[in-house]
Amino acid sequence: MVVWIIGYSGSGKTYLASRLLKKIKGKKIHIDGDDVRKFLTYDLKYSLSDRKKNSKFISDLCKFLESKNYYVVCSILSIFREHQIDNRLKFKKYFQIYLQSDFKHIKKRNNKKIYSKSKQVVGVDIKFPKPIRNDLIIKNKFKPFTEMMIKNILNKIDDI
């Protein structure tokens, strides 16, 4: 199973992934786009072509882990719709969550200090296209996810 969490940088993808993983039993792993870039694809920059390579690498990594029977939760910007479409064909079980957040609020919070840059930043000079064919859209108001919310999300995932 691969759960693919999409949203702006700073939208809460990693937080949601960590909350879900605490409730998932068995072999599980969190693949975070920031960690992959830091440790595995550090040679890639932030151009669209390098972002595409990074996204493809992450998708392939998730496929490998799925083939080893891991429950994979991936938090990623995922700005390429063709990768979202390919994921539905690539993975045995795939569930896509769009963590929809108000960009003005994210930019104001600027937790990762990336929105003060003006080059090659998604949401600033690179468009963030709304993800397609989402299995679940969560409107993040930046309040903690309750146990009931996490349970409801996992129930929706289990229903596929």
Region locations from a protein language model:
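Walker A (P-loop) ATP-phosphate-binding motif of ABC ATPase nucleotide-binding domains
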Residues: 2
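Hydrophobic anchor at the beta1->P-loop junction of P-loop NTPases
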Residues: 5
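P-loop (Walker A) phosphate-binding loop of NTP-binding proteins
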Residues: 8
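ATP-binding Walker
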Residues: 11
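Walker A/P-loop
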Residues: 14
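Conserved substrate/cofactor phosphate-moiety recognition/catalytic segment
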Residues: 17-63
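Conserved phosphate-donor/acceptor-positioning beta-strand/loop module used by diverse small-molecule
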Residues: 73-75, 87-109, 138
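Small-molecule kinase domains that catalyze NTP-dependent phosphoryl transfer to phosphate-bearing small molecules
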Residues: 100, 108-160
